[in-house]
A protein has these predicted regions:
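Small/aliphatic-rich secondary-structure junction motif
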Residues: 1-56, 150-199, 218, 225, ...
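Structural beta-alpha unit
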Residues: 1-3, 53-57, 71-104, 218-249, ...
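Glycine/Thr-rich phosphate-binding loops of Rossmann-like dinucleotide-binding domains
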Residues: 17, 79, 114-115, 162, ...
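Active-site phosphate/pyrophosphate- and oxyanion-stabilizing loops and adjacent acidic/basic residues
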Residues: 25, 71, 124, 170, ...
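A short acidic, glycine-rich active-site loop
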Residues: 54-64, 199-208
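Intrinsically disordered, low-complexity Ser/Thr-rich linker and spacer segments
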Residues: 140-150
Length: 281
């Protein structure tokens, strides 16, 4: 299990960072981790290419602004500040890889009329490419999760990759002294509630899923209560998190665009609709 000694918190100076920073500070204190506050200056384009001389000026002004940002919120922590130029998602991923970052923490940024359905492109890039776990909060300002999580739910999809995810979740919850629950969601059979035969088939599917997850849990050597829910995956995960008062969801990223298990293909939806922050492993 990794020792979480370096947290990266990318900053774009948006209001969302003010809602996320209490979590960052709490995690850093609990894990005794260094925090790097990082801002990325995106390329300025004119005509056929970028204008590097403007980027240099922007780096200087961004660095000055970064030095003034969140000073009170991170007081007493081990903090470094970094400014890079380039495409934000790429620069965040590269910095994390080159500087032994153990955890990236960042709010999501979806904009426009579809904000409730989207996560920002930068967050999506980091989720897809980062080598380390990524903590995200789609609605940190409205969420009421405890900054030090005491209740964690690990969403497992029933594939062999779930074994390592369970082990990771058990170890991570131990850092915080948090309780851990396992959750698996099986999709509903169409109109199953209307027909006795379909209800029986649905219960058989639920029990087969329970047996499959139980076998994986045994392989993982994890002692945690397990729930198998039936319903649309994103909605069922959000509902369970609300009912259990979860402070943190744990999901497996895998290859977010690949068909490696239903929960992985629904990762973005789970993040966007979760009532609490999500860490993607």
């Amino acid at each position: 299990m990794t020792n979480y000694r370096h947290i990266l918190f990318p900053i774009d100076f948006s209001p969302q960072i003010n809602a996320a920073i209490p979590y960052v500070a709490a995690f850093a204190r609990q894990l005794d981790a260094k925090v790097t506050l990082m801002s990325v200056v995106p390329p300025i384009w004119a005509g056929r290419g970028p204008i590097p001389e403007y980027a240099a000026d922007l780096e200087i002004s961004t660095r000055a602004r970064l030095d003034r940002t969140l000073t009170a919120e991170v007081h007493g922590l081990s903090v470094e500040r970094a400014v890079r130029s380039g495409e934000p998602g790429e620069q965040i991923v590269r910095f994390a890889q080159e500087n032994a970052v153990d955890l990236v923490m960042m709010p999501t940024h979806g904009y426009g009329v579809f904000r409730s359905l989207l996560i920002g492109s930068v967050t999506a890039k980091v989720l897809h490419d980062a080598h380390c776990p990524v903590w995200t909060a789609a609605h940190a300002a409205e969420q009421h999760a405890r900054h030090i999580p005491k209740t964690m739910i690990c969403c497992v999809d029933g594939t062999p990759k779930s074994v390592e995810l369970m082990r990771w979740a058990a170890a991570f919850s131990g850092y915080f002294g948090a309780t851990l629950q396992l959750l698996h969601v099986t999709p509903p059979i169409a109109d199953w509630a209307a027909f006795a035969g379909d209800r029986k088939l649905q219960e058989e599917e639920r029990e087969m899923a329970r047996a499959r997850i139980e076998a994986l849990r045994s392989r993982a050597g994890v002692e945690a209560p397990m729930k198998v829910a039936v319903g649309p995956i994103v909605a069922a995960v959000a509902e369970c998190a609300s009912e259990e008062g979860a402070d943190l969801l744990i999901i497996g990223r895998g290859l977010l665009g690949a068909t490696l298990g239903r929960l992985r293909t629904h990762a973005h939806g789970i993040i966007q609709h979760s009532p609490c922050p999500v860490v993607s492993v």
